[in-house]
Amino acid sequence: MEIRTTEQFDKWFRKLRDRKAKAKISARLRQCEISDHITGDHHGIGGGISEMRFHFGPVYRIYYTIDNDVLVILLIGSSKDDQSRGITEARKLLALYRGE
């Protein structure tokens, strides 16, 4: 499974100060690539967007979409505290990706 990221996701990930969280998130994404499917706690939130949940720290979330069953686009990340903002931003990014 190929995983691509948006600039917004990359910026969010770079700003994460919790090294353990970054390592756990990176490990899970590598596991998804290797196993060729989304692993761990995840579910659809509607409109073609799903979220991966990471139950440590402030409970991180990564919003993503799947394109053609092989490409995962990581739209943006957030914590539980700014979840609604993260979902709104993910919807905007998906619309841009789709050319809407």
Question: Which positions does each model-derived feature cover?
Answer:
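Basic, Lys/Arg-enriched alpha-helical interface segments
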Residues: 1-59, 68-72, 79-100
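Short, surface-exposed charged micro-motifs
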Residues: 63
